A protein has these predicted regions:
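Short acidic, glycine-rich surface-loop motifs adjacent to enzyme active sites
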Residues: 213, 219-226, 327-347
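Bacterial N-terminal signal peptides that target proteins for export
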Residues: 2-9
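Extended active-site neighborhood of metal-dependent phosphoesterases/phosphodiesterases
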Residues: 122-128, 136-157, 178, 183-189, ...
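Beta-rich interaction/scaffold domains
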Residues: 521-701, 709-715, 719-729
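Divalent metal-dependent phosphoesterase catalytic cores across multiple superfamilies
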Residues: 31-262, 268-289, 318-325, 353-367
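Sec-dependent signal peptide cleavage junction
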Residues: 19-33, 696-707, 726-731
């Protein structure tokens, strides 16, 4: 475990020598992060609205979490309540009025005490069962017969489904960063507010792309703060991170999207992880204070969730074998663990991470695991198909030896690379070149019947912290990416294929190819997939024109090829994989109701405004700008290729344009004896008195840029916002 301290200590020594000012002014430069107020999602008043909402959420420790049940017919609920409240229950119904509901009774256990309010909380856990696929339900939950308002939740297909992968939300991790225009670190509360806004945005963007996702997997580190020195009693009662859990659980979408959380190193040593989440099939194997391993099935897939903060490989082996035995006949086996054992970020070469690799990988291979999902390094990486990596004891380094070499490179921002033979031999040996499978059948983005495992490392889904990739890309890496923008993956599964697509949340462009693993496909499987695709033809008007054209062309090609009943297996697999990807890539058109409302209001404002220099009038240039913004919004409304993401961005940009227009109104300021534009201080400049919820100069960059379509019609100067992304020097702290 590597912690960078040299620069921090140097900064503190200098600070003490020079001044008695609080050392927080000299807080060490932290990792890259996404400063929420400058993101595209924060524009049009969204950030200010979030800040107001956050005030009602930040002290709410009682928010609900929903986790997949032991199989697709179940869901698990968990929430805090006052210890005086008893009898936790969940009701489920197919009717909004909750008629004909079924009631499920749960259990309570002691949780934590809020030291400020002296409120003692208990953890409520309820499992509901009997769920049918592709069905709309409504649920309420509560204690003492006090029920929440009904919430809609939809079950999805179990034979052809999609789930999301999110890496390291780590809400609150940006606390050491300094906001634009400030001199001190923002601290925990503001960092949680910042990171939670971005976390909300990632989930909303993911659901805009795939509204029928079955669930999400978080690769660990839901929160950030923990006490490494706490004894067991203190760890079980720890509450300093409850505000972070409040932020993590704050997205409204999580009230209807189950999440399977992995125990990360920041979660592992605090008891409240186990109070907030009701995991299925839990085990004492792989346990830390937060809990142990668990597993569940969904359709034809077994999901194995490992707590590898416990490094006892024999316990993980025993658990994996038990999970596989209990699951029975499944097509896919997916393991999730936190540490990126085949990643490419700044933790990936650490001896303790690599040591964990060589303990676990043989177990995965013995049990025919297909895909391993990880996080920890806050950067994206996809491995090649790997099998048979072996540790070279002769070149292995101790943690201290490795840190001495790595520090030189790290502290030079990788401009000075170590050429020491011992270090280079170590790095070469852990590239596992012998594990790279070269005899694969690959057609485009499809890999057929691979012998080996695909490893995915998820980037940060919240932008609370980013790490760099290491300067020497490992041989086992097929692709990697880091541009300090939150990302998520959409993973779709059916009986013979599994596809992974990964998106950046600012433009919603893919950061990597869609990779599809195709198992043995028979001619009958292809005919079934064609029939499934043809069923979508009646819904043509629901999808964006560009994705529909690609889908329709692929379907026609598949049907033509399938006319030959003597196709070889390789061609059948290729056609099947291509058709599945085309179906997965279909994007729904956006709902333009809100945009039309904003257009109507903007037109009314424009039509009622008068050009002139008198108070209450507007400059002609301002009217021209607003007219351009309105016309651009109308273009989005009339487009056949506008997804929900594009429509939402159009709403945001039109709101910005309206606000800018309103700020140009001529006002008479008696005290100054003159006429000025609204927002002016009377001398031609604009006041910029910063408050904690406001956004300083919006010329700051967050890495946001527009979708290709948005660039075409939304990024005109009249409504565009140039955004940049601050990327700060890394301080690696695990």
């Amino acid at each position: 475990m590597i912690k960078r301290t040299k620069k921090v200590m140097a900064a503190l020594i200098v600070a003490i020598m020079m001044t008695t000012t609080s050392y927080t002014v000299f807080s060490a430069e932290n990792d890259g992060w996404t400063e929420a107020p400058y993101t595209e999602a924060a524009q049009g008043g969204a950030w200010e609205a979030w800040c107001e909402k956050w005030e009602t959420l930040k002290n709410d420790w009682t928010q609900l979490s929903i986790t997949p049940g032991k199989n697709e017919t179940e869901l698990n609920f968990a929430w805090y309540s006052n210890k005086e409240e008893t009898s936790p229950k969940v009701r489920i119904s197919k009717n909004l009025d909750m008629s004909n509901s079924v009631e499920f009774i749960g259990e309570q256990s002691r949780a934590v005490t809020n030291k400020e309010t002296n409120v003692e909380y208990v953890s409520n856990k309820v499992t509901i069962s009997g769920l049918e696929e592709n069905t709309t339900y409504y649920y309420t939950y509560g204690t003492n017969e006090n029920w929440s308002e009904p919430v809609e939740i939809n079950t999805q297909s179990t034979s052809n489904f999609t789930f999301f992968l999110a890496g390291d939300p780590q809400i609150g991790s940006s606390l050491k960063n300094t906001a634009t225009g400030e001199t001190e670190a923002i601290g925990q509360e503001r960092s949680v507010r910042n990171d939670s806004f971005n976390w909300n945005n990632t989930i909303e963007k993911a659901l805009s792309l795939v509204p029928n996702a079955s669930f999400m997997i978080s690769a660990g580190d839901q929160i950030s703060i923990r006490d490494k020195k706490a004894n067991m009693e203190q760890a079980l009662a720890y509450t300093d991170n409850e505000i972070e859990y409040a932020g993590y659980l704050s997205p409204d979408a999580l009230k209807s999207l189950p999440v399977a959380t992995t125990i990360g190193n920041h979660d592992a040593i605090s008891g409240n992880y186990s109070y907030h989440f009701n995991n299925p099939n839990t085990s004492t194997l792989g346990s830390t204070v937060a809990g142990g391993n668990y597993h569940y099935t969904y359709g034809n897939t077994l999901f194995i969730m490992l707590n590898t903060n416990n490094t006892n490989a024999q316990e993980h082996k025993q658990f994996i074998e038990q999970a596989i035995a209990e699951a029975g006949d499944v097509t896919w086996k997916v393991v999730t663990l936190h540490q990126d054992i085949y990643g490419s970020g700044e933790h990936s070469n650490e001896p303790e991470i690599v040591e964990l690799r060589y303990k676990l990988v043989p177990i995965f291979e013995e049990n025919d695991i297909d895909v391993v999902l990880t996080g920890h390094d806050h950067t994206y990486a996809r491995s090649k198909i790997l099998k048979g990596g072996v540790k070279d004891e002769s070149t292995f380094l101790t943690g201290d030896e490795y840190e001495e070499f790595f520090d030189i490179e790290f502290e030079s921002d990788y401009t000075e690379l170590v050429e020491d033979e011992k270090y280079l031999n170590y790095l070469e040996s852990i590239e596992d070149k012998n594990a790279i499978q070269s005899d694969l059948i690959v057609k485009g983005e499809n890999i057929y019947n691979p012998e080996g495992i695909l490893y995915i490392t998820a980037n940060s889904a919240s932008g609370s912290k980013y790490y760099n990739n290491v300067p020497r890309q490992q041989a086992y890496i097929a692709n990697r990416w880091q541009e300090d923008v939150p990302t998520f993956s959409a993973i779709s599964v059916d009986n013979v294929s599994l596809s992974i697509s990964t998106y950046r949340t600012d433009t919603m462009e893919k950061i990597d190819d869609t990779i599809t693993i195709v198992k043995s496909v028979e001619y009958g499987n292809l005919l079934e997939k064609i029939e499934e695709a043809e069923a979508k033809l009646a819904d043509k008007e629901k999808y964006t024109s560009s994705t529909w054209v690609a889908f329709e062309a692929t379907l026609l090609s598949a049907k033509k090829i399938a006319e030959d009943t003597n196709l070889n297996e390789e061609l059948v697999s290729e056609v099947y994989g291509n058709l599945k990807v085309a179906m997965d890539q279909l994007v729904l058109k956006g709902d333009t109701i809100e945009l039309n409302v904003e257009i109507t209001a903007a037109e009314e404002l424009l039509n009622n405004s008068v050009v002139g220099n008198e108070a209450g009038q507007y400059p002609q240039e301002a009217k021209n700008e607003l007219l351009v913004a309105i016309n651009i919004a109308k273009e989005v409304c009339s487009s056949d290729d506008a997804s929900q993401i594009i429509v939402d961005e159009a709403v945001s940009k039109l709101k910005e344009a309206v606000n800018r227009f309103k700020n140009t109104v001529v006002v008479k300021e008696e005290a100054l004896g003159g006429i000025t534009n609204n927002g002016s201080n009377g001398n031609g400049s604009t006041s910029n008195n910063s408050i904690s919820t406001s956004k300083p100069n919006s010329g700051v960059n967050t890495g946001d840029s527009s979708n290709i379509f948005v660039y075409g019609i939304l990024s005109l100067a009249a409504v565009g916002i140039v955004a940049l992304n601050f990327k700060k020097k890394k301080e690696i702290v695990k």
